[in-house]
Regions:
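Extended catalytic core of nucleotide-activated donor transferases of GT-like folds
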Residues: 1-120
């Protein structure tokens, strides 16, 4: 996805929630998750994106997305998801919960599974 945006002359900033958490664990923030939320919000303020696309960003809290919406309500939020969501796929309950977790805060969702498999 990033490569497609870059090839179409868009400025892309990739943020890895896992890397930020891994590199920022401390006594004050044992899990690194608080630091992640703060870094995302500060980056959002500085970068001023037109769109945020989440891919397997399970560690990004809903409250962080809500704060970003408060800062700039015109930014579009989307997510993409490649893992299977059908009942017969591996770990379908967990995958379905992951895709639905932030769906009320998003403008769009891109799936590789037929959306009817979500039973929403």
């Amino acid at each position: 996805i990033n490569n497609g945006f870059i090839r179409n002359s868009h400025n892309v900033l990739t943020v890895s929630d896992r890397d930020i958490i891994h590199n920022n664990k401390s006594i004050k923030d044992i899990s690194g998750r608080s630091t992640l939320q703060n870094k995302i919000i500060e980056t959002f303020k500085n970068f001023k994106p037109d769109i945020i696309i989440l891919g397997h960003a399970d560690r990004v809290k809903k409250s962080t997305l809500e704060k970003m919406r408060e800062i700039n309500n015109s930014t579009k939020f989307s997510q993409w998801f490649l893992d299977p969501l059908s009942k017969h796929g591996p770990d379908h309950i967990n995958n379905t919960n992951r895709i639905l977790d932030k769906i009320d805060l998003l403008d769009s969702t891109f799936l590789t599974t037929d959306p009817s498999a979500l039973s929403v």
